[in-house]
């Protein structure tokens, strides 16, 4: 059964100690997990891997699993922020955020084992209908999983939740691969799979806008 997730990308304010941001965020996700509808969370440190689109400009990802209807859960979170149940520091408004709801296409995701993930956001060319793109990507994902170091993957239809005014995104699809190995090895493995003919490319592939990040877990998975 596919699940729903929330991907919250962020970059802390300039000058803020990274350790302070990390300590605050670990407490912050605990507060959010207390909101009805949030079931699990894990935090990741990010490194840009491919492209210049979202989410390559961020340094941190909080990945939440949401039970039930995401809109209801997000509404409860907003109420918790307004009433102070989820407290925010003075510098919170200076954090750069972009948040997306991921509606499950294939899953459910396993945060407990997800120590290292390769996250791929994408936007198809305008001439490709979204359902056709999602169908193609299901095959593409399985072809990518033939590359060494790529173990399992999950796909989501993206819906923007909090838009970064400095980097608005029109990405509609996210693929999260559970991987092992260093980024140069993973890139080489993908190239080898393509060169060997195990990964096919439609004629419109090069019109896709990609933004990919290499994400290493910086905290254990937490559940409610």
What are these regions (language model features)?
Residues 1-224:
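Macromolecular interaction modules
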């Amino acid at each position: 059964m596919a699940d729903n997730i929330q991907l919250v990308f962020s970059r802390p304010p300039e000058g803020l100690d990274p350790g302070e941001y990390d300590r605050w965020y670990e407490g912050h996700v605990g507060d959010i997990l207390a909101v009805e509808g949030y079931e699990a969370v894990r935090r990741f440190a990010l490194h840009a891997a491919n492209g210049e689109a979202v989410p390559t400009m961020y340094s941190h990802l909080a990945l939440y699993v949401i039970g039930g209807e995401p809109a209801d859960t997000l509404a409860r979170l907003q109420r918790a922020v307004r009433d102070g149940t989820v407290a925010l520091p003075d510098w919170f408004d200076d954090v750069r955020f972009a948040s997306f709801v991921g509606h499950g296409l294939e899953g459910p995701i396993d945060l407990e084992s997800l120590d290292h993930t390769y996250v791929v956001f994408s936007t198809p060319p305008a001439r490709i209908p979204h359902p056709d793109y999602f169908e193609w990507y299901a095959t593409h994902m399985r072809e990518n999983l033939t590359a060494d170091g790529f173990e399992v993957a999950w796909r989501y239809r993206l819906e923007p939740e909090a838009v970064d005014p400095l980097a608005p995104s029109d990405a509609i699809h996210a693929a999260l691969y559970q991987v092992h190995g260093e980024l140069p090895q993973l890139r080489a493995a993908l190239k080898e799979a393509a060169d060997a003919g195990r990964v096919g490319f439609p004629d419109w592939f090069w019109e896709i806008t990609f933004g990919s990040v290499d994400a290493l877990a910086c905290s254990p998975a937490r559940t409610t």
